[in-house]
């Protein structure tokens, strides 16, 4: 697992946003993985996720505070979190500023429809060229259809590891575009769910807020974060 930490973007959030905007301006193709402990745990058991993390073309950013803490325990200088939902928000802002195009893929039908309505209102210069909920059967065909539209931004909200695999396996179909797997961000961006209060965000305890709101997350948290911590402690520094 230690090799994964060598792949983490470590220039800080401001530099990342500058590079993100420049990529959007210049029509580069970029695949951003928002890594948390669960991502790295999947990488240990899933060959595709392993390849995604280690692929030098993939931009791996430290989404979870567990990744930041573990990085520093292992001697890597990771400055701060770069949350996936904040990346999605920045892309909406930059896309609006630069009059770019976007495609939304994922979440429940009512959620993505509400998101589209909100984005049209809040980001009038950002052109939505399509959207699809996450409950369609042939997702690769949807990606093929999206590639023909050639959007500047593609946000995929299917949850790990499905969103990362889908993007990675279909990336060659696209000539340009910024691709990000954003998990449950559509729920928050659409207004269907509230993000954690600022005190949780500031103290890097959004994970705790999610568990309080959804206790069923405890098992998932244990299987990813707690087991991840045990693995990190066994790694030679």
Question: Which positions does each model-derived feature cover?
Answer:
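Conserved beta-alpha
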Residues: 68-145, 149
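N-terminal nucleotide/polyanion-binding subdomain common to many enzyme families
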Residues: 1-80
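Short, well-ordered alpha-helical microsegments
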Residues: 41, 112-113, 139-140, 163-167
């Amino acid at each position: 697992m230690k090799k994964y930490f060598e792949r983490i973007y470590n220039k800080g959030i401001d530099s990342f946003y500058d590079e993100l905007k420049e990529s959007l301006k210049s029509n580069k193709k970029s695949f951003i993985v928002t890594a948390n402990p669960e991502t790295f745990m999947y990488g240990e058991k899933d060959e595709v996720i392993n390849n995604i993390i280690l692929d030098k073309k993939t931009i791996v950013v430290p989404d979870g505070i567990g990744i930041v803490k573990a990085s520093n325990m292992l001697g890597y200088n990771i400055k701060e979190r770069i949350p996936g939902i904040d990346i999605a928000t920045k892309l909406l802002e930059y896309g609006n500023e630069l009059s770019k195009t976007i495609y939304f893929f994922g979440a429940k039908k009512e959620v993505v429809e509400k998101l589209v309505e909100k984005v049209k209102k809040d980001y009038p210069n950002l052109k939505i060229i399509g959207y699809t909920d996450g409950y369609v059967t042939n997702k690769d065909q949807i990606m093929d259809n999206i590639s023909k539209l050639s959007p500047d931004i593609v946000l995929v909200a299917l949850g790990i590891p499905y969103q990362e695999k889908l993007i990675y396996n279909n990336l060659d179909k696209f000539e340009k575009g910024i691709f990000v797997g954003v998990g449950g961000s559509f729920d928050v961006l659409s207004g269907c769910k509230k993000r954690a209060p600022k005190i949780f965000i500031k103290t890097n305890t959004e994970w705790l807020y999610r568990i309080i709101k959804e206790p069923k997350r405890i098992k998932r948290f244990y299987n990813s974060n707690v087991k991840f911590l045990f693995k990190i402690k066994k790694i030679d520094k």
